[in-house]
Design a protein with these regions (language model features):
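Generic structural signal for well-ordered alpha-helical scaffold segments
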Residues: 17-25, 48, 52, 85-89, ...
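Ligand-binding beta-strand-loop-alpha-helix segment within the catalytic cores
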Residues: 56-120
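Short, glycine/acidic-enriched capping/hinge loops at junctions between secondary-structure elements
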Residues: 16, 43-47, 74-76
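N-terminal glycine-/serine-/threonine-rich phosphate-binding loop
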Residues: 1-32
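Short beta->alpha linker loops
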Residues: 7, 38, 104-107
Length: 120
């Protein structure tokens, strides 16, 4: 494990973006794990800046959200699906049909979890 000490949130985003881009460099279909919350926002903001600058293209990428609330409508603005669409998919210009979020409103959550695991 490597510990990297950064001076501020912006530097955290830059360092993290550099690592992500090294991992996906040359991949025709990069696959990203997508978390919600405030921790990854600096990374997402820096990746969005680089997308806007033409330095990287995630339009063919695939995304998998880490989690979703149980029982929430996926169209609810507070759902993780909508959060991921707003904070990641739109700014990174990803195809929303290529981004998966666990189905927290499925009638059989165990089956939905297995299907999601298989998709990953």
């Amino acid at each position: 494990m490597e510990v990297v000490i950064c001076s501020d949130e912006q530097q955290v985003g830059q360092v993290a973006a550099n690592r992500v881009l090294r991992w996906v460099e040359g991949l025709a279909t990069p696959v990203l794990g997508l978390a919600t919350g405030s921790s990854p926002l600096a990374l997402y903001n820096e990746l969005a800046r680089r997308v806007a600058a033409g330095e990287v293209d995630f339009s063919c990428g695939i995304g998998f959200a880490l989690d979703e609330y149980v029982g929430i409508d996926p169209e609810n603005p507070l759902s993780y699906r909508q959060t991921i669409l707003r904070t990641v998919v739109e700014p990174l210009r990803m195809d929303p049909t290529r981004v998966r979020v666990p189905n927290g409103s499925a009638p059989d959550l165990a089956t939905a979890a297995l299907e999601y695991d298989r998709a990953i």
